[in-house]
Amino acid sequence: MARIAGVDIPRDKRVVISLTYIYGVGRSTAQEILAKANVSENTRVRDLTEEELGRIRSAVEEFKVEGDLRREVSLNIKRLIEIGAYRGIRHRRGLPVRGQNTKNNSRTRKGPRRTVANKKK
């Protein structure tokens, strides 16, 4: 397995797909990286030379990926919580942040249902 940005990328997949295993790199960013590194998208990772891997690594270093990106996202969320912004309050309460309806849905953010027992008469 080739190691790029601290992530083992799969050997048997095409390079453009393998790069998406890095946090912060999607398909379009992977294509951009390969264009800068002058490497074909259809090449398999196992067929890459050390020189090509080096060019890909240097192209990836220009982007904010993995630990730096995760840290930036978490700091942004902490900042929203500290300043008391509406989005920060939604993060703190574990509710959807982007205005989604919460009457029936949003189970992913809320977690499993907590049923409330009926009051006895």
UniProtKB/Swiss-Prot annotation:
Swiss-Prot/TrEMBL keywords: Ribonucleoprotein, Ribosomal protein, RNA-binding, rRNA-binding, tRNA-binding
The family assignment reads: Belongs to the universal ribosomal protein uS13 family.
Q: Where is this region: Disordered?
A: 94-121
Question: What InterPro entries would the database entry show?
Answer: Rbsml_uS13_C (IPR027437), Ribosomal_uS13 (IPR001892), Ribosomal_uS13-like_H2TH (IPR010979), Ribosomal_uS13_bac-type (IPR019980), Ribosomal_uS13_CS (IPR018269)
Function noted in UniProt: Located at the top of the head of the 30S subunit, it contacts several helices of the 16S rRNA. In the 70S ribosome it contacts the 23S rRNA (bridge B1a) and protein L5 of the 50S subunit (bridge B1b), connecting the 2 subunits; these bridges are implicated in subunit movement. Contacts the tRNAs in the A and P-sites.
One GO CC annotation, please?
A: small ribosomal subunit
Q: What is the lineage of its organism?
A: Bacteria, Bacillati, Bacillota, Bacilli, Bacillales
Task: State which gene encodes it.
Answer: rpsM
A single GO molecular-function term is: rRNA binding
Subunit details:
Part of the 30S ribosomal subunit. Forms a loose heterodimer with protein S19. Forms two bridges to the 50S subunit in the 70S ribosome.
Under which name does UniProt file this protein? Small ribosomal subunit protein uS13
**Which Pfam families does the entry mention?**
Ribosomal_S13
GO biological process: what's one of them?
translation
What SUPFAM superfamilies would the database entry show?
S13-like H2TH domain (SSF46946)
Gene3D superfamilies linked to this entry: 1.10.8.50, 30s ribosomal protein s13, domain 2
Its signal peptide is none
Basic residues bias locations: 106-121
